[in-house]
Amino acid sequence: MARQPPAPEPTLEQLDQEITLQLQKIDANLSACFSKITKDIIPAVARYGAVCDDALSACSWLRELFQKSSDIQLATEPAAPAPAAESLFPQAPAPRAPEVTTEGHVLAVPVSSDDEPDDGSTLQRQHKRRKLSLQLQQRYGSSSSSSFVSRSPTLRTRPASSPLRAPDDPDPPAVLRFAAR
């Protein structure tokens, strides 16, 4: 009697079934990963990309703003007048800044000088200065605004606008800081 070796076929079938089961598990895992990527991760990355694009456009606008602000040239002295040339569109003279006392009061120019045309002559400027000096003298008892002493009882007895700050405290200077290039 010849003995046959143990059945090799059941072992091959068993291995084939185990391989098929493992491949099915791998396929299920890949399907779950694909679903997670397409439903959760890709939309989140797209939203993040939109936010980054918005931030990038805002930053490029700020970069342009700062670059253009660094190109500004501040005039420290008035420019020399250009030679007189005829223009089709004559420009009105620039408005003058009002004169202010050390207490912050705006000095009004007398009405009579408003009626006179401003030709910029030396006599007219001297005349305006005299009127202004007279106005200061009448209002404050002194023609010098730099040595102003309040004689008004309302200015001396007015309470401070804040309990933490005395009226004699100077305003802190404004400080602007820019990053160095």
Curated annotation (Swiss-Prot):
Residues 77-181 are annotated as: Disordered. Residues 133-165 have a biased composition (Low complexity). The keyword Cytoplasm applies. GO terms for cellular component: cytoplasm; DASH complex; microtubule; mitotic spindle. InterPro entries: DASH_Ask1. Its main location: nucleus. It is found in: Nucleus; Cytoplasm, Cytoskeleton, Spindle; Chromosome, Centromere, Kinetochore. One of its GO terms (biological process) is protein transport along microtubule to mitotic spindle pole body. Keywords: Cell cycle, Cell division, Centromere, Chromosome, Chromosome partition, Cytoplasm, Cytoskeleton, Kinetochore, Microtubule, Mitosis, Nucleus. GO terms for molecular function: microtubule plus-end binding. Pfam families: DASH_Ask1. The keyword Cytoplasm applies. Signal peptide: none annotated. Belongs to the DASH complex ASK1 family. Component of the DASH complex that connects microtubules with kinetochores and couples microtubule depolymerisation to chromosome movement; it is involved in retrieving kinetochores to the spindle poles before their re-orientation on the spindle in early mitosis and allows microtubule depolymerization to pull chromosomes apart and resist detachment during anaphase. Component of the DASH complex consisting of ASK1, DAD1, DAD2, DAD3, DAD4, DAM1, DUO1, HSK3, SPC19 and SPC34, with a stoichiometry of one copy of each subunit per complex. Multiple DASH complexes oligomerize to form a ring that encircles spindle microtubules and organizes the rod-like NDC80 complexes of the outer kinetochore. DASH complex oligomerization strengthens microtubule attachments. On cytoplasmic microtubules, DASH complexes appear to form patches instead of rings. This is DASH complex subunit ASK1. It comes from Eremothecium gossypii (strain ATCC 10895 / CBS 109.51 / FGSC 9923 / NRRL Y-1056) (Yeast). The gene is ASK1.
